[in-house]
Amino acid sequence: MNSSIMLASGSKIRAELLQNAGIDFTVMLPRVDEVSIKAALLADEATPRDVADALAEIKARKVSDKNPGALVIGCDQVLEHRGTLLSKAATEEEAEQQLRALRNDRHSLLSAVVVCQDGQPIWRHVGVVRLQMRDFSDAYLEGYLERTWPSISESVGSYKLEEEGVRLFSRIEGDYFSVLGLPMLELLGWLTLRGDVQG
């Protein structure tokens, strides 16, 4: 089919993943009030999976409406811990609070990807990863925050697994690409089946 591919995301890591896989694409940032949308979804008792999926679809639709014929990839990732969704930390103090809450406990990352064409969703997937943080010391936590802030403010949970954040964990169950925010294997498989990516 060879439709043009667009990424509706400002995430550097998502763009790098597609680029490293040899995918030809362009980036267009969607203008979406994620905080308000997430709050409305949670008020309607949406599940974490539904929140991630809905936000990914809204982002993809927004860009798709302006780019007829293009395959627009929208993504979102949420972190669920003991029934609560954690957002990106706004301050270093908030990052410390999040990491103290996650320390020596399990949480889940849900990474949604929705592809829209001509304003309509045509494919979707949600990757789920379960992670166990180790019982790291307060001294390590302080040093970690000094070394990684403000970079970790870009990520839910206040860590980047592709960087020093990997040292916070004792166990990870699931797909590495989903941890990074884009379930690549499923997306590439679908694009290949469609003929938009050579297989």
What are these regions (language model features)?
Residues 24-35, 114-120, 154-166:
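Mobile beta-alpha loop/short-helix "lid" or hinge segments that flank ligand
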